Amino acid sequence: MKLSHWHRAQGDEVTLARTPSPSMFEPQYDRVYGSSIFGWSKPVIQRLRDAYPDAIVGGTGIDDWTTTIEEQIGEGEYEHYDYSIYPEYQFSMGFTQRGCRLNCGFCVVPKKEGRPRSVNTIWDIWRPDKEKKIVLLDNDFFGQDEWRQRVEEIKEGEFKISINQGINVRLINEESATVLASLPYYDENFTTRRLYTAWDNVGQEDIFFKGANLLKDAGIP
């Protein structure tokens, strides 16, 4: 979506393909991109590279996952999205922050994005022609120094939010638990009140349940 937005802004025509191999009537493209999240997609990525040897491939599912969109387009933080390639999608999505305070061995976020920093306000993410429903893709919402400002924006703007990537429950404290309980949080479809968390390491059971109990005590079921 970011690449599509940037290319359209340059006057380019963009096609979204869902298969790695061209069809019989596929046109010739000036540039081809591919993205892989998981390692088990490597055979599919290889098919893409066989079909388009000059394809630019990124994502955490390939060996060299350090390639970023910003490097490809020669810009800094680029937080613009082309929703036209998913016309059925009616919400707004984006990041208010990048990076993470944790350094889990299995995760590339701290290696790729560094320490937490703010990149957008809630108002930056919202599409004014849509309902006030925001899917937040933040990996560590409370890791950014400006999280209190983001909370005020949610409340003052009467937004509903879905913290799609979950909350770092291991880093929850009484203040953040109380704040979460006061927010209109929902599942990714905005049909059910739901807060996502992750339990990535069984050895951290005590830390996990300490955070979970703080959420429960704050009124989050």
What are the language-model segments listed below?
Residues 55-82:
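Ser/Thr/Gly-rich flexible loops in soluble cytosolic domains mediating phosphotransfer, phosphorylation
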Residues 1, 6, 87-129:
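Canonical Radical SAM [4Fe-4S] cluster-binding loop centered on the CxxxCxxC motif
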Residues 10-12, 26-30, 50-56, 70-71, ...:
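Short glycine/proline-enriched coil/turn segments at helix->beta-strand junctions
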Residues 15-18, 54-59, 93-95, 135-138, ...:
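A structural signal for short, well-ordered beta-strand segments and their strand-loop junctions
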Residues 1-57, 62-64:
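A short, structured N-terminal alpha-helical element that caps or precedes a catalytic domain
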